[in-house]
Amino acid sequence: MGKRAGGGATGATTAAVSTSAGAGLEPAAARSGGPRSAAAGLLGALHLVMTLVVAAARAEKEAFVQSESIIEVLRFDDGGLLQTETTLGLSSYQQKSISLYRGNCRPIRFEPPMLDFHEQPVGMPKMEKVYLHNPSSEETITLVSISATTSHFHASFFQNRKILPGGNTSFDVVFLARVVGNVENTLFINTSNHGVFTYQVFGVGVPNPYRLRPFLGARVPVNSSFSPIINIHNPHSEPLQVVEMYSSGGDLHLELPTGQQGGTRKLWEIPPYETKGVMRASFSSREADNHTAFIRIKTNASDSTEFIILPVEVEVTTAPGIYSSTEMLDFGTLRTQDLPKVLNLHLLNSGTKDVPITSVRPTPQNDAITVHFKPITLKASESKYTKVASISFDASKAKKPSQFSGKITVKAKEKSYSKLEIPYQAEVLDGYLGFDHAATLFHIRDSPADPVERPIYLTNTFSFAILIHDVLLPEEAKTMFKVHNFSKPVLILPNESGYIFTLLFMPSTSSMHIDNNILLITNASKFHLPVRVYTGFLDYFVLPPKIEERFIDFGVLSATEASNILFAIINSNPIELAIKSWHIIGDGLSIELVAVERGNRTTIISSLPEFEKSSLSDQSSVTLASGYFAVFRVKLTAKKLEGIHDGAIQITTDYEILTIPVKAVIAVGSLTCFPKHVVLPPSFPGKIVHQSLNIMNSFSQKVKIQQIRSLSEDVRFYYKRLRGNKEDLEPGKKSKIANIYFDPGLQCGDHCYVGLPFLSKSEPKVQPGVAMQEDMWDADWDLHQSLFKGWTGIKENSGHRLSAIFEVNTDLQKNIISKITAELSWPSILSSPRHLKFPLTNTNCSSEEEITLENPADVPVYVQFIPLALYSNPSVFVDKLVSRFNLSKVAKIDLRTLEFQVFRNSAHPLQSSTGFMEGLSRHLILNLILKPGEKKSVKVKFTPVHNRTVSSLIIVRNNLTVMDAVMVQGQGTTENLRVAGKLPGPGSSLRFKITEALLKDCTDSLKLREPNFTLKRTFKVENTGQLQIHIETIEISGYSCEGYGFKVVNCQEFTLSANASRDIIILFTPDFTASRVIRELKFITTSGSEFVFILNASLPYHMLATCAEALPRPNWELALYIIISGIMSALFLLVIGTAYLEAQGIWEPFRRRLSFEASNPPFDVGRPFDLRRIVGISSEGNLNTLSCDPGHSRGFCGAGGSSSRPSAGSHKQCGPSVHPHSSHSNRNSADVENVRAKNSSSTSSRTSAQAASSQSANKTSPLVLDSNTVTQGHTAGRKSKGAKQSQHGSQHHAHSPLEQHPQPPLPPPVPQPQEPQPERLSPAPLAHPSHPERASSARHSSEDSDITSLIEAMDKDFDHHDSPALEVFTEQPPSPLPKSKGKGKPLQRKVKPPKKQEEKEKKGKGKPQEDELKDSLADDDSSSTTTETSNPDTEPLLKEDTEKQKGKQAMPEKHESEMSQVKQKSKKLLNIKKEIPTDVKPSSLELPYTPPLESKQRRNLPSKIPLPTAMTSGSKSRNAQKTKGTSKLVDNRPPALAKFLPNSQELGNTSSSEGEKDSPPPEWDSVPVHKPGSSTDSLYKLSLQTLNADIFLKQRQTSPTPASPSPPAAPCPFVARGSYSSIVNSSSSSDPKIKQPNGSKHKLTKAASLPGKNGNPTFAAVTAGYDKSPGGNGFAKVSSNKTGFSSSLGISHAPVDSDGSDSSGLWSPVSNPSSPDFTPLNSFSAFGNSFNLTGEVFSKLGLSRSCNQASQRSWNEFNSGPSYLWESPATDPSPSWPASSGSPTHTATSVLGNTSGLWSTTPFSSSIWSSNLSSALPFTTPANTLASIGLMGTENSPAPHAPSTSSPADDLGQTYNPWRIWSPTIGRRSSDPWSNSHFPHEN
């Protein structure tokens, strides 16, 4: 109880009225009570409180609060503060009172003496006032407190604490009944001096008229809620409106039952005599304690003194346990005739673990209570209540009041939880309202009748009065009924009857039955008064399968057929009907009663099978109660006559005669099933069998099939109509109407006796049910046993034989029956015998037997053959398995043998979707997938290990029967053979003894006949084994049939059966070389066995010599001797002749060179390096001799190897060498002739040659390209050429390093690193090092004499732009550079009109150099040396050059300005070199060199070919052409050639100034020298060393013997007019794109560096240092024919001489003195020999000042230098060429051309200067002859080594090769004494 202080009212009352409703209630109260303010409502609600407060004010400072057992006295002391006295038990008060006043009269008097409240409804308080009188005249009684021990009574405080003598006071007592029944209590009044006075109070609690009850005893856990619904009953005849509802606050809140926030007034309006839930009291428990609250309800029926106060007491606890959602199961008010009322029990588990609920039962046992409970577990700590049980109360079973209430006991399995008890109660009203049933029963006549009125009387058997408030008619009855004379309400006293109303019935014509209820609304809930209207008619329908229900239609019947039809009659009237009779109308009909039962239409149809069998024919009448039916059978027996038959059935009742028509058509004929008995083949789950069902129609008309059905309930039998089946059966025919199927799997589902799911090892193993797994077979036997047990169970119960009956109905005949029989079987996938017996088998061999499998199922079957040995414990089931499959008993089954292996040759192994793969899955396990019905055979191989009999089992695992087994038995044995009774082996010696007597012919001097020394012996060969032996071959020590003198005569194959024998004859014929011959006789059988016996022959030792002499000699011996002698003699003479010719070939060039050097006047040091002056020294006849083939490059008309090279451009080598470096393959003189012939077609052979060579120079010099090709060329050349040639080559190669474009995709065919590698510094390995000197000297000799004439011719030709041979243009590769690059395919030569080429050039021009650079970069994968794109860094320089060349007229400039420009350029070059790491590819030394003056003049040529740019453009344009796929090839043409062409041609085919515009200077020109280490330094050193090489060169003049086999490199002075420094620069400066494959950056390739370092010949280093100035040889693209040739000049597009000066200074300051490689200026290491160039050499060259940097730069300008400059000292027997590791320079190689150096299979096959096998070399097109023609095409691509064949076409593309001096001339067999063609290609 709430504790409240105050007077007047009890704490309970005060609490109830002092607090307004909770959040949800206040608006509800306001709405229900109408519009009033909250304050007004609160004041009204506190009406009772005010009364109590007033009374409390009169009580003096005292109050009490009471509970059941404790009295707590509250006393007000003087200070007005309420203090709590010691709380005493009730007994202490009584004792104190008794002790004080024993024997005395009471000093105080109560009025009334005791208080009786009489009956009060529960929850409705009543207050009475009690007065206290003090009868004493003296004493003042001081009242301390008042208390009680019950919660039903509450007392207020006293009006006055002190009662004066004779005075009085009063207090109020409130009775608030909580339960129904008597309540009494004693109030204790404590005084200060007079002890304790007692006062008795009484009351009786009666049921609340509103059926409200207090909510007491609720127990909930903390943080849970208690939410009962407040249901209010309206006991009034008027609607009851709930006006207000309040809670005392705290944790109690009021909510709408629906959970909504508000509602309308209707929500709180309760119709009369109805009960409605109006509010939900929600108590939320926040803390553990006993909580008390009150709910006050006010209605519109309440007066000012009537209150409804409901106490709410809730115990909130923290103890874990089970709690109920309600404190009581209140079933409410029930009548005995009501249906049972059901309430649900919801529980909550507040514990920490789940609790199973074990039982829910009523206590005590109560028949009226039924508990529907299933064991359930309450989850721990759930916040929601769980439904545990349903409790139903059946009022009809509650016979006594003790059954109206009790407890429901809930027990949990948790012992620590106490049992939970929930009280229940119900108010049962015993009684009913009686009425006359006939009064509410009405009959509808056929004709309309008058309205009928019937008074309705009701009898009340209840113990209380029944007040009928309203009468309601159902909707369907309102049309015929009305209620009259009902004045509400009507009261019927208990056990009395009374008139209620009159029911008016107005029948309607529509005959309908009404069976409904009139609703009576009373104070005892609602009553249903049944009212029924009936017609008395019967309902009937014909039972299925007939479609027509209203008449009996037999359809078409055969004349002999009798048919039955059932029909039912139903009495749906509310009265019973008597069927008096039934009879038939018509012939052949009969009727009988089948059944009479209660039910409706559904019941009848469901019982149809029973009705068809039953019969009640003995009855003639029957009475049908309401809701009953009768079933009749009508039988028609057809007559023989055909026709329509009509009849009827009549059924008579009191109300009607029911007539049912009958129809039939009778036809003659019959239908029969065929076959009558269908026997289906055996099947099993997984196999569906079927058979067709046919019907024979003997009627004379079509018969229509109406129905096919199975009369059995077995779902495994079913039928399917086929698409082709017709509905009509043709007369006189047998028709197939359906297929009857039997599917055994339909009934067993997942539990069939065969068939399991199969899981492959890749599938997850989690699968419900039993399944087989691919890789787990140890449980197979258990699975098999369980399945087989199921099968045996079926078989034992005869469940394997099944039958069904199918019925076919047609329109003419019904019930055509066919019996179907099916049989279940145990399947097997084995279709071959289970016992495999192998024949005797040799232990070395195998025998095979076949097992045939067939899948009998309709689903795939997964099969695994597993040897028994693979089971972990086979002994457990082997015996059972043998008996299970009736396998024949054997002595012993080997459980561990693996001698039997199953295999299958399947070309297309299947794989299931699950991952199960056919074939051998692991050791000895064979997997198979059998599709439905598929047959497969597998082979079992028996490979015996021992000579014994082996028996084992092969388990056939499958997911159909799990296991099947095959018994395999085989015997192993060996083949045994004896010869002459001896076993094979070392001891089995078969003796042949030749005695002296047999050799008597040896000593026969007459020798009249051929001596015969053959000994013959016969041996017996026996087969002593069990196997038949087939001897395949007989060998004698490895020779078949005969050998070493032995011979088997009958040596054919033969066969020996067991224990058979055969004779063999062996002959022995000695050769008398040994006295004892021991050999092996080997018999080899078809099974592979070998039997070895020893043949032992002995001869008399002393007769060996004699007999050997007696042997005859062969007749061909003498002839052979003569032939061999002749051949050797001829070969000797041939060698002598060849040696002479070779000596001549070496001596002539050498002599020519000596004469050239002798006639070469000294040069002025101060004058520019002018090649023309040098050339002028030599006669032009030499030039003619050389005929400078188009293949010749421009520096030296031919430097030894160029002549042999196919043309630098075309690279068709005569030799087979395919190496890219072998592109300098030897050219036959035929090539040269072809070239000349083609050249002669143009203006002059020289011009054409020069043009071609320049073109090839352009093309080849581009070819100089690849570091790959270059390096390869170098290595080849290095090996093949002499030192001098190698020097020239090195120059050219030096160019090619510049041209190297890193082409990672094209690795150098030869793994010679392009990067400088110090170890490579050693002399390059020569292809044929034995002749190092020859190659070089050969080249030198040819060069020297022809150079002067050649250069003069070139200069003369320079002025002609006329008609160079069109062949020059034909080289244009149609494909872009990448093609030729990568593929090394010969470029197709297309002759394009100059205009087209010019247009293409213009297109190229349109593209900025940047684009060209991009293009070339794009094309240049690895190291395309010939790409025309300029290095981005050098582009400005190039552009500058091109601009100058385009805009300027060729004005002669002073050499000083040229020198300064050269210096500037070289400086720029140096910077660029530092910035851009590139692979320095020396361009071919064939680049023409043009002095600056001449180059400027050339720029002014009408063809606009500024020579410097022309060169670069030539080389570059060539690249550009290939890169872009345009005809820019023309740009690659040497300017000189351009001179001979028309302007258009110049533009198209030569690099005119416009061409140069299009094509930025060659990348090698513009690219700074790539430094491997410090390339600039090394080049600088090289230049210094070259300057210091004077003495060496002098020696070279006198001693021309080359020390290096490397190809004679044309001296740079003669290199295509390129200055030496330009060569150096070109080699050292590399294309921006040229990256060393090893990725070294900003380093000159060592190829360009000193010979000793880069692995390139010094010349290559010089070439690397080659100046790229426009005037310099920049990158003399593979020697251009003339200085004018654009290729050579274009190469000079180096940044060093952007001014276009042709002289880039032979010693361009490429080298950096500060570089570590720096050497003194004048020291030059030529091929490993250092020498000083400043001496005689430079005095001859005309160097006037010491070689400082400027002078070195000016060296570009020196056009000529004696070839001896490049010769290695004779003292070097082997060249010190280091294998060019860094910058293989194809250019050098190309310059050197196809030098057929003795040691290079291809000219320069392994060029000294090229470690890279790139086909890019102009000559290295081995694979692509044309590609090499367009050097640019092959520049980067190491061409596949294809033997390059020389052809005239080659010459077209060849650049003018200074080395052409060495090319074979008409009068010379070969300029290269050791042409490459004579030696196989190195690689």
Curated annotation (Swiss-Prot):
InterPro entries per record: Ig-like_fold, Ig_TMEM131_2, Ig_TMEM131L_3, Ig_TMEM131L_4, Ig_TMEM131L_5, TMEM131-like, TMEM131-like_Ig_dom2, TMEM131-like_N
UniProt main location, coarse: membrane
Bias type Basic residues, positions: 1380-1394
Record GO biological process: collagen biosynthetic process
Positions annotated with a glycan in the UniProt record: 300
Ranges annotated as biased composition (Basic and acidic residues): 1330-1343, 1353-1364, 1395-1417, 1436-1458
Keyword Signal in record: yes
Membrane disposition: Single-pass type I membrane protein
Gene3D superfamilies: Immunoglobulins (2.60.40.10)
One GO MF term: collagen binding
Region spans: PapD-L domain: 109-283
Residues in compartment: Lumenal: 23-1117
Effect of residue 1564 to A: Does not affect TRAPPC8 binding. Abrogates interaction with TRAPPC8
Entry's free-text remark on domains: Possesses a PapD-like (PapD-L) domain similar to PapD domains involved in assembly and secretion of bacterial pilus components. The PapD-L domain can bind collagens and is probably involved in collagen assembly and secretion.
Composition bias type Low complexity, residue spans: 1237-1261, 1423-1434, 1619-1630, 1773-1784, 1837-1849
UniProt key word NAD: no
Compositionally biased region (Polar residues): 1510-1526, 1542-1553, 1678-1690
Protein's name in the database: Transmembrane protein 131
Region Disordered, annotated ranges: 1198-1580, 1593-1656, 1670-1712, 1766-1789, 1832-1858
Similarity section: Belongs to the TMEM131 family.
Localization per Swiss-Prot or TrEMBL: Membrane
Organism superkingdom: Eukaryota
